[in-house]
């Protein structure tokens, strides 16, 4: 079976001290890049998509193409629902073959967040589907998710312990100073807070908003318990910048088989870098 839960791969990463990258994809080309590159580097892989991605590309298309690529490259992978907010939406996608889910109730008060997440866990675990949830709230923009910096909240370590105990989640997304999108200035991550969370929570931790972070920060976060690193915006920028440059140099170009190649190559370099920083090359 090539479409798998992310639970075992994150537990393996936790025990071995590396992280698994979760790359957000949007279409055939971006899916090809992340699978082909992970296969070349023999890296575990989580392919992530927001609700907007699944609406754009088609749920069945993503599952079918990812499954075909996984078989072609002999690379078991997780297709992950990133920042999903609806239990009904999650239920339908799990029934279609998804086995890795993030339920995002971080915009709710603590008790409501717990109740929503618990309902998702109760459903997903019946189908061997792993569940990630977020406590605290990241600022920034990702697809339709927009959180003003003034509304961002850091994860409370004591609440994190309660949250994990009451929900039964498999991984916890923490807010320690990262944000969705690229950074206007170098962020200051609260590693002391992360260490406190790690001391109180024994499940894998997840770092959202890794695009543009210094490599040293990512490595330090991994040393403090982060087992999954999410990258989205940095991939889109590399891909689109290469496309723009190609058309500047070739204004009459019209063959996607040609102009997609430099875009895919630019994105591949980012994927290779992230896999290297996560320390997961050769970990299959």
From Swiss-Prot:
The name this protein goes by in its record: D-tagatose-1,6-bisphosphate aldolase subunit GatY
Catalyses which reaction(s): D-tagatofuranose 1,6-bisphosphate = D-glyceraldehyde 3-phosphate + dihydroxyacetone phosphate
Summary of subunit composition and partner proteins: Forms a complex with GatZ.
Known role: Catalytic subunit of the tagatose-1,6-bisphosphate aldolase GatYZ, which catalyzes the reversible aldol condensation of dihydroxyacetone phosphate (DHAP or glycerone-phosphate) with glyceraldehyde 3-phosphate (G3P) to produce tagatose 1,6-bisphosphate (TBP). Requires GatZ subunit for full activity and stability. Is involved in the catabolism of galactitol.
Name of the top EC class for this enzyme: lyase
Pfam families listed in its UniProt record: F_bP_aldolase
Pathway: Carbohydrate metabolism; D-tagatose 6-phosphate degradation; D-glyceraldehyde 3-phosphate and glycerone phosphate from D-tagatose 6-phosphate: step 2/2
Organism field: Salmonella paratyphi B (strain ATCC BAA-1250 / SPB7)
Keywords: Galactitol metabolism, Lyase, Metal-binding, Zinc
Domain of life according to the entry: Bacteria
């Amino acid at each position: 079976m090539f479409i798998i839960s992310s639970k075992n791969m994150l537990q393996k990463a936790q025990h071995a001290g590396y992280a698994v990258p979760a790359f957000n994809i949007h279409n055939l080309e971006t899916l090809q890049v992340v699978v082909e590159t992970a296969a070349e580097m023999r890296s575990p892989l989580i392919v992530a998509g927001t609700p907007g991605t699944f609406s754009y590309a088609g749920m069945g298309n993503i599952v079918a193409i990812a499954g075909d690529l996984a078989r072609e490259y002999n690379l078991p992978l997780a297709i992950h629902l990133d920042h999903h907010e609806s239990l009904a939406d999650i239920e339908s996608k799990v029934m279609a073959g998804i086995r890795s889910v993030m339920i995002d109730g971080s915009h709710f008060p603590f008790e409501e967040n717990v109740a929503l997440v618990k309902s998702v866990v109760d459903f997903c675990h019946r189908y061997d589907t792993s569940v990630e949830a977020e406590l605290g709230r990241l600022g920034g923009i990702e697809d339709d998710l927009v959180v003003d910096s003034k509304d961002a909240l850091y994860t409370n370590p004591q609440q994190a312990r309660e949250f994990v105990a009451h929900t039964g989640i498999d991984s916890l997304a923490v807010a320690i100073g990262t944000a969705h999108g690229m950074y206007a200035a170098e962020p200051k991550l609260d590693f002391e807070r992360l260490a406190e969370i790690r001391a109180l929570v024994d499940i894998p931790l997840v770092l959202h908003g890794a695009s543009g972070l210094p490599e040293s920060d990512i490595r330090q976060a991994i040393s403090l318990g982060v087992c999954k690193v999410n990258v989205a915006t940095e991939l889109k920028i590399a891909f689109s910048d290469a496309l723009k440059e190609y058309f500047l140099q070739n204004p009459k170009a019209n063959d996607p088989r040609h102009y997609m190649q430099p875009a895919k190559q630019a994105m591949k370099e980012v994927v290779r870098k992230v896999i290297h920083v996560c320390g997961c090359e050769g970990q299959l």
